[in-house]
Amino acid sequence: MIRTPTRTKTLSFAGPQVDFHFPSPESAPNGSLDNYHMSNHHLLNDAVARSPSQNSSGTSNGVDSAHYSFANISDNTTGVRNAGNGKRSSQAPSWSSGSGSCRRYPVTLAPITNASALARPGDSGAADVRKNDTAAFLRRKRSPEDCALHSISTSAYTIPTADNISFQITFGSSDKSHSLGSLRRSPSFGRRLPSRRTAGSSNNAPVSASLPARAASVKSTQSTLKRSQAVRCKGGLLQFFMQVGVRAKNRIRRWRLAVRKKLFTYKAKRLAKKNKKQTTSHLKRGNGYVSNIQRSISSASLRNSQRKNSDSASKETPATVARSGTLPNPLETPPKTTRKSLRRSPSSIKRAASILTRANSSGTITQGTAEKNNAGENIPRTKLVRSGPSLSLSSIARQPSIVVNNKVIPLTSLNEDTKDFTIEEEDEDEYVIDTDCMKKSVRGYSQSSSGSSNSGKSSDETYHDSLENPTPDESLLPDEKVSRALDAWNHYLRAVVAQRVLMRLQIRRFQESGGDPECQELIDAIISDYEENSSSHCDSDLRSDSTSLTSVSDCEGRVSSSVASDVSVGITGSIFSARPFQQTMKNSVKRSLTLPVGFRV
């Protein structure tokens, strides 16, 4: 049976193998062959030995060469481990000096390359090898217990694989030089099982000149894996230093935890001493506290106190001069009238805007109001409290003030003689207004609305503005409160109605002059909306005030009768129906602008 493979190349053994032939009976040795000689393994070996080729692997050990060694199986994933490395004398096989009985079966079916490099002795040496192999084979055949212990087909004469590669194969038809050459290329096998040597291995010691002479004297003890110096030192200094390092690391970790617990625990008593030095309060720090007494004293009160001192000193000077004859010391220069700007903070603004009076304000009257009362002016005393000079901030009563755009304007700093209330009214919603008096007056008006008709006849000259002459609630009776509230309301209605009538008269003049038609339409739209808004609010007030405004009401009636024909379009054609104009009016016009102080809508 001759099989020629169809493949022409394989990468497993580095080269073409076209001349490879499987073993067959034609390649068997001359002479009659028994069952043993007809077995597959030695026929393969004979065919490989008798057909030398240049196409073979450099190593014969399948495990060391990182290839599967039988039937040309290879994964081609790893390289040869010992490729290109020269073999040292210590790596020579320990059983390579034996005879043919020590030879083992080649572990690959690939043909052998480098045939010239193999040490081939003469024909006499080959004949001696064959004789020794035959003698060893006959001895095995004659011993029954050896056959019982080691089966020829399973143990001693099996094809080597990764499992049973350590078994030795002895036969009489192989070439000694080839087997020795293959053993020389695979030194790792001699290290693994040196105890498989036979008795006749010492006869053929000088097989090749390249083999060392001391290879036969190597002991047959099983060697262990080679370890580095660091691993050998594991049980010595290296292990000692490793344990020292582990113990030191654990100790440092415990110390670190103890220090952190000691420093950052708050349950135990703190070792740090508390500083008992008194510091400024959080209120003073938040409000920008400055240890300056003049900040807590109004300049007006200081001036008043200095005037008192100067008057008393001027009265005493003539007597003292007459007695002593010396002039008194000149008075010190008065403080500057310029008031420093207040340092503002949220808390200071709230305190300054709050309206508080002294506890004894009902029994004390300031100097200015006393002088005015003595002069004969029937002006009720104001609610404003002027603070006297003091050295402590806590004893000064908070002055009534007003807040405009985050600026505190104390009402005591205003000039009461000229009534100079110059406050820019940018946004009336920010004003702080006390509405308690108005609420009380509204309640009194609701209770005594039936008998309050006679109080509405008071004249316009007796009305005083609430901002100019505020009166405390304690000095007024309920009837007086109701009458004053009605007077203020009637004054408001008369002023508003008069302004509206004057505007209508002016519009009438523009109409009679004959202007632009677009201007005429605009005037008509304004008049229509104005009439609808004002008629419902002012009918009752106009009836009550008809006596004082007879001429104005007649003019208003003439204007309304003459313009009634032009304003037949109604609210649908008014200018206020336009969306942009409505948005502008909604954002700019505020109802509280046309109400007296103290009323809210």
From Swiss-Prot:
Cell compartment(s), UniProt: Bud neck
Biased composition range(s): Low complexity: 89-101, 443-457
Similarity comment: Belongs to the AIM44 family.
Gene that produces this protein: AIM44
Highest taxon of source: Eukaryota
Residue span of region Disordered: 1-38, 77-101, 174-214, 271-386, 443-478
Polar residues compositional bias, start-end: 1-11, 198-207, 289-304, 357-376
Signal sequence, start to end: none
Organism field: Lachancea thermotolerans (strain ATCC 56472 / CBS 6340 / NRRL Y-8284) (Yeast)
GO cellular component: cellular bud neck
Biased composition (Basic residues): 271-285
Cysteines paired by S-S bonds: none
Major subcellular location class: other
Compositional bias ranges of the Basic and acidic residues kind: 458-467
Coiled coil: none
Listed name of the protein: Altered inheritance of mitochondria protein 44
